[in-house]
Amino acid sequence: MRRRKAKMRAYERLLNYVKVYTTSEDEQENVPSTSRQFDLGNQLAEELKKIGVQDVRIDDKCYVYGVIPATEGLEEKPAIGFIAHMDTAPDFSGENVNPQIIPEYDGGDVKLGDSEYALTLKDFPHLVSLKGRTLITTDGSTLLGADDKAGVAEI
């Protein structure tokens, strides 16, 4: 099987995924805790099919599965699986997410949009090591949902 290369980069997928409302509900014992999590699950299943992943399916618990066969001649080597969750924490709103993209971060405090919130160097001293890089944050009005949609985007 010849796989097609994904045309989107991981950060582009992340920006798409964080906009899908997948906030969980703590009081629910069902898996998933909300049916809206299937919105992202179905989107992921379609994307996997488009890039040539085999046996793509989504089950009644919203787990998305797919198979990428071993490279010819390496079929006897150990297999690997990747796991990431799609739901986001109910601690703060995850609906109508507006990511804030900061190209060439200047190394200082990061104001989160027009909100009262900021990522300060006092609270997050490691930020200085990201100077010059592109940061993706929330605008402060919602959670970003990068836990674990960033993992989903990478996979």
Where are these predicted regions, by residue range?
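Short, Lys/Arg-enriched N-terminal segments with co-localized hydrophobic residues
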Residues: 1-7
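A generic structural signal for short
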Residues: 2, 32-33, 143-147
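Active-site metal-coordination/substrate-binding segment of hydrolases
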Residues: 74-154
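Alpha-helical scaffold segments in soluble metabolic enzymes
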Residues: 13-16, 43-46, 154
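Electropositive phosphate-/nucleotide-binding environments in soluble metabolic enzymes
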Residues: 8, 35-38, 42, 149-152
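A non-catalytic alpha/beta surface segment that caps or lines the substrate-entry region
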Residues: 29-77, 81-83, 87
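N-terminal capping segment at the start of a domain
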Residues: 7-35, 137
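Structural signal for hydrophobic packing residues in well-ordered secondary-structure cores
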Residues: 18, 22-25, 48, 52, ...
